[in-house]
């Protein structure tokens, strides 16, 4: 039930944000995503803080796999302060089949998937030619993630991504790095492993 509520909050907020785009320039997704290359495990390098990830303190990953119905399964995992892992399973469908760079994602239960508001925009707005990193955003600029195939990213690449994101209307000052390779110890203090 908790996963449903968190997923519902994400979808509802993303739906509201699409109405509040105002004077932002039109957001463009990358021209093409090869889904076979996009599948697999991604490490969250950084993000805009959001309510549905507030329990996460590090080791956040997203793993994509192909489903038989042509959609993608999304498994998000993160480490919580108490040392346990939290997992949320979602589904993604391709919103733009010519480019594969615009997805609709839901974490709500399948029996309400017919409701449009449970599907949130999830656009690939920057992508390394070798698929070593991907940047995700949505037209309202309320959500933003930097993902990579490795748990660490060199600072030069990270800064270049932030500069490109800023030119698209995202705010680098809101971006928060995600710790990877951490564990919890007594008192909720984090250590790198």
Where are these regions (language model features)?
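A beta-rich soluble binding module of mature secreted/lumenal proteins
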Residues: 7, 16-193
């Amino acid at each position: 039930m908790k996963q449903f509520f968190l997923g519902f909050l994400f979808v509802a907020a993303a739906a509201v944000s699409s109405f509040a785009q105002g004077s932002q320039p039109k957001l463009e997704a990358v021209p093409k995503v090869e889904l076979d290359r996009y599948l697999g495990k991604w490490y969250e390098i950084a993000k805009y803080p959001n309510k549905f990830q507030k329990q996460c303190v590090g080791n956040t990953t997203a793993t994509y796999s192909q489903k038989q119905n042509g959609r993608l399964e999304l498994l998000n995992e993160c480490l919580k302060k108490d040392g346990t892992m939290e997992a949320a399973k979602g589904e993604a469908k391709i919103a733009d089949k010519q480019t594969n760079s615009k997805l609709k994602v839901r974490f709500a239960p399948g029996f309400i998937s017919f409701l449009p508001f449970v599907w949130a925009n999830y656009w690939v707005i920057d992508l390394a030619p070798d698929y070593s990193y991907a940047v995700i955003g949505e037209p309202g600029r309320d959500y933003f993630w930097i993902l990579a195939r490795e748990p660490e990213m060199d600072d030069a690449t990270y800064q270049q991504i932030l500069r490109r994101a800023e030119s698209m209307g995202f705010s680098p000052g809101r971006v928060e790095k995600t710790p990877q390779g951490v564990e919890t110890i007594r008192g909720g203090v984090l250590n790198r492993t």
